[in-house]
Amino acid sequence: MRILVTGGAGFIGSEFVRATLRGTLPGSSGTQVTVLDKLTYSGNVLNLAPIADLRNYRFVRGDICDQDLVDDVVAGHDAIVHFAAETHVDRSIGSAASFVRTNAMGTQVLLEAASRHRLGRFVHISTDEVYGSIPEGAWDEESPVAPNAPYAAAKAAGDLLALAWHRTHGLDVVVTRCTNNYGPYQYPEKLIPLFTTNVMDGQQVPVYGEGHNRRQWLHVSDHCRAIQLVLLGGRAGEVYHIGGGTELTNLELAEQILKSCGAGWDMVRHVPDRPGHDFRYSLDTTKIRTELGFSPRVAFADGLVETVEWYRDNRAWWEPLKSPDEATGSPGDAGR
């Protein structure tokens, strides 16, 4: 199979590319991968260094909104796995234009190219944030989208465009929506790496409000395995939820990170809450479990310890990426 991975130099995209080319994902042996990435601040070619010399890998630097480039790159592929997105909620509140451009308009450009070249599958990677907050219970795939942040609204627009392309043009589209991710190579503005690297630098960790907002957490390797199952076996025109089932408040998460780093509560600093901060997200994952046999393999406690160890051992990777403003300001979107 020849797949085009957009945003493949980012956190989740690069994990998917590395695992695919190493043959550790189901049915990935022999896959040829092209990565298309603009290399914005959160994209990093070092994330792809472990597989950069493989013959079945190609990297193209470019913008998914560039119609001519996208049309040229898409040609000759069997499928697109579309990770490319602007993902920082706080940045979207301050300036939404780039989020709408990339997450909605960029998706449209890719869908048009996929239709022209008659690709066999388009997997659109999305987020639980498109549903907005849910006080109890869990959203299923039939729940209506009701995003609150501009980031989530732009992602929802991309989701709806992708599904509309299936219904209108017959393109084989599948949408995945996932809970928060964590693991190696995550940009240090995000909650877990921000907290972890702050503690390693002797700086306090900033917790929004009272710290009672709740999120579900999934290791990035489990997310990518689920995406591969959807790529190979998901039903066209469907949405699949991907989640880990480990739900924590931000304070509970901070406690586990501090424990893993050998630090105490004096390292916590409460900061003003984000405008329109969703209190809780939760996804029902029955569909992907029953149809595709997915279940997470990485226990959160084990994965968190391994993640903290990775940041401890890879300061040379994250230190150049981390600005003083990120260390002292508010945490970014938790796990995208």
Curated annotation (Swiss-Prot):
It is an enzyme of class 4 (lyase). SUPFAM superfamilies: NAD(P)-binding Rossmann-fold domains. One of its GO terms (biological process) is nucleotide-sugar metabolic process. The active site is at residues 128-129, 151. Keywords: Antibiotic biosynthesis, Lyase, NAD. Its cofactor is NAD(+). NAD(+) binds at residues 7-13, 37-40, 63-64, 102, 151-155, 181. Gene3D superfamilies: NAD(P)-binding Rossmann-like Domain, UDP-galactose 4-epimerase, domain 1. It catalyses: dTDP-alpha-D-glucose = dTDP-4-dehydro-6-deoxy-alpha-D-glucose + H2O. CDD domains: dTDP_GD_SDR_e. Pfam families: GDP_Man_Dehyd. Binds 1 NAD(+) per subunit. Coiled coil: none annotated. Its EC number is 4.2.1.46. GO terms for molecular function: dTDP-glucose 4,6-dehydratase activity. Pathway: Antibiotic biosynthesis; novobiocin biosynthesis. Substrate binds at residues 87, 127-129, 180, 190-191, 206-208, 215, 250, 274-277. dTDP-glucose 4,6-dehydratase involved in the generation of the deoxysugar in the novobiocin biosynthesis pathway, an aminocoumarin family antibiotic that targets bacterial DNA gyrases. Homodimer. Belongs to the NAD(P)-dependent epimerase/dehydratase family. dTDP-glucose dehydratase subfamily. This is dTDP-glucose 4,6-dehydratase. It comes from Streptomyces niveus (Streptomyces spheroides). The gene is novT.
